Protein backbone atom coordinates (compact mmCIF):
# COMPACT_ATOMS: atom_id res chain seq x y z
CA UNK A 1 0.00 0.00 0.00
CA UNK A 2 1.43 3.37 -1.07
CA UNK A 3 0.99 6.13 1.55
CA UNK A 4 1.77 9.81 1.00
CA UNK A 5 3.09 11.62 4.09
CA UNK A 6 2.82 15.42 3.77
CA UNK A 7 4.69 16.81 6.78
CA UNK A 8 7.03 19.81 7.00
CA UNK A 9 8.52 18.72 10.34
CA UNK A 10 11.31 16.36 9.27
CA UNK A 11 11.43 14.55 12.60
CA UNK A 12 7.68 13.85 12.58
CA UNK A 13 7.81 12.82 8.91
CA UNK A 14 10.67 10.40 9.58
CA UNK A 15 8.91 8.94 12.63
CA UNK A 16 5.70 8.34 10.66
CA UNK A 17 7.64 6.90 7.75
CA UNK A 18 9.49 4.42 9.98
CA UNK A 19 6.27 3.25 11.68
CA UNK A 20 4.51 2.86 8.34
CA UNK A 21 7.43 1.09 6.67
CA UNK A 22 7.73 -1.40 9.54
CA UNK A 23 4.13 -2.44 8.81
CA UNK A 24 5.11 -3.27 5.24
CA UNK A 25 3.56 -0.17 3.65
CA UNK A 26 5.33 2.02 1.09
CA UNK A 27 5.63 5.61 2.43
CA UNK A 28 6.44 8.59 0.20
CA UNK A 29 7.33 11.75 2.14
CA UNK A 30 7.03 15.37 0.99
CA UNK A 31 7.69 18.50 3.04
CA UNK A 32 5.27 21.16 1.77
CA UNK A 33 1.88 21.72 0.19
CA UNK A 34 3.24 22.27 -3.33
CA UNK A 35 5.10 18.97 -3.30
CA UNK A 36 2.02 17.25 -1.87
CA UNK A 37 -0.11 18.49 -4.77
CA UNK A 38 2.57 17.45 -7.29
CA UNK A 39 2.79 13.98 -5.77
CA UNK A 40 -1.00 13.56 -5.77
CA UNK A 41 -1.14 14.54 -9.45
CA UNK A 42 1.53 12.01 -10.42
CA UNK A 43 0.68 9.01 -8.25
CA UNK A 44 -2.45 7.20 -7.10
CA UNK A 45 -1.90 6.78 -3.37
CA UNK A 46 -3.93 4.42 -1.22
CA UNK A 47 -3.86 6.96 1.63
CA UNK A 48 -2.56 10.47 2.32
CA UNK A 49 -1.44 11.68 5.75
CA UNK A 50 -1.46 15.47 5.63
CA UNK A 51 -0.19 17.97 8.22
CA UNK A 52 -2.62 20.85 8.64
CA UNK A 53 0.08 23.56 8.77
CA UNK A 54 2.58 23.36 5.90
CA UNK A 55 4.39 25.88 3.70
CA UNK A 56 2.71 27.03 0.46
CA UNK A 57 -0.60 25.17 0.93
CA UNK A 58 -2.28 24.08 4.15
CA UNK A 59 -3.36 20.52 4.66
CA UNK A 60 -6.98 21.53 4.07
CA UNK A 61 -6.00 23.20 0.78
CA UNK A 62 -4.25 19.99 -0.28
CA UNK A 63 -7.35 17.94 0.57
CA UNK A 64 -9.59 20.45 -1.25
CA UNK A 65 -7.35 20.12 -4.35
CA UNK A 66 -7.49 16.32 -4.11
CA UNK A 67 -11.29 16.31 -3.87
CA UNK A 68 -12.25 19.13 -6.27
CA UNK A 69 -9.47 19.35 -8.88
CA UNK A 70 -8.36 15.73 -9.04
CA UNK A 71 -11.83 14.36 -8.17
CA UNK A 72 -10.25 11.64 -6.02
CA UNK A 73 -11.71 10.14 -2.87
CA UNK A 74 -8.36 8.92 -1.55
CA UNK A 75 -8.61 8.39 2.22
CA UNK A 76 -6.90 11.22 4.14
CA UNK A 77 -5.72 11.50 7.73
CA UNK A 78 -5.13 15.06 8.96
CA UNK A 79 -2.23 15.63 11.36
CA UNK A 80 -1.96 18.61 13.70
CA UNK A 81 -0.13 19.64 16.84
CA UNK A 82 -3.42 21.19 18.00
CA UNK A 83 -6.80 19.65 18.62
CA UNK A 84 -8.82 22.43 16.95
CA UNK A 85 -12.57 21.68 16.72
CA UNK A 86 -13.00 24.11 13.80
CA UNK A 87 -10.29 22.39 11.75
CA UNK A 88 -11.75 19.01 12.65
CA UNK A 89 -15.18 20.22 11.46
CA UNK A 90 -13.75 21.54 8.17
CA UNK A 91 -11.83 18.31 7.66
CA UNK A 92 -15.00 16.30 8.29
CA UNK A 93 -16.85 18.35 5.67
CA UNK A 94 -14.17 17.32 3.16
CA UNK A 95 -14.69 13.65 4.02
CA UNK A 96 -11.39 13.25 5.82
CA UNK A 97 -11.02 9.78 7.32
CA UNK A 98 -9.41 10.76 10.61
CA UNK A 99 -7.50 13.26 12.71
CA UNK A 100 -4.15 12.61 14.42
CA UNK A 101 -2.76 14.92 17.10
CA UNK A 102 1.03 15.30 17.41
CA UNK A 103 2.94 13.92 19.07
CA UNK A 104 1.31 10.80 17.69
CA UNK A 105 1.11 7.35 19.23
CA UNK A 106 2.42 4.77 16.71
CA UNK A 107 -0.30 2.25 17.59
CA UNK A 108 -2.98 4.93 17.14
CA UNK A 109 -1.50 5.96 13.78
CA UNK A 110 -1.57 2.37 12.53
CA UNK A 111 -5.11 1.83 13.81
CA UNK A 112 -6.32 4.96 12.02
CA UNK A 113 -4.55 3.89 8.81
CA UNK A 114 -6.27 0.49 8.92
CA UNK A 115 -9.68 2.06 9.58
CA UNK A 116 -9.23 4.66 6.81
CA UNK A 117 -8.28 2.17 4.11
CA UNK A 118 -10.90 -0.38 5.19
CA UNK A 119 -13.65 2.15 4.42
CA UNK A 120 -12.64 2.47 0.75
Where are these regions (language model features)?
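Active-site beta3 strand of CheY-like receiver
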Residues: 43-49
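Conserved acidic carboxylate
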Residues: 7
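The feature encodes the CheY-like receiver
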Residues: 55, 84, 102
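Two-component/phosphorelay signaling modules centered on CheY-like receiver
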Residues: 10-28, 94
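C-terminal output helix
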Residues: 86, 104-113
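Acidic catalytic/metal-coordinating carboxylates
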Residues: 32, 58-62
Amino acid sequence: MKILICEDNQLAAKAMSVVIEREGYDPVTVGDGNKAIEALQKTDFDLAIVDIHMPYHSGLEVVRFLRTELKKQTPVLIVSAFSDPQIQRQAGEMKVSGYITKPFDPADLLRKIRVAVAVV
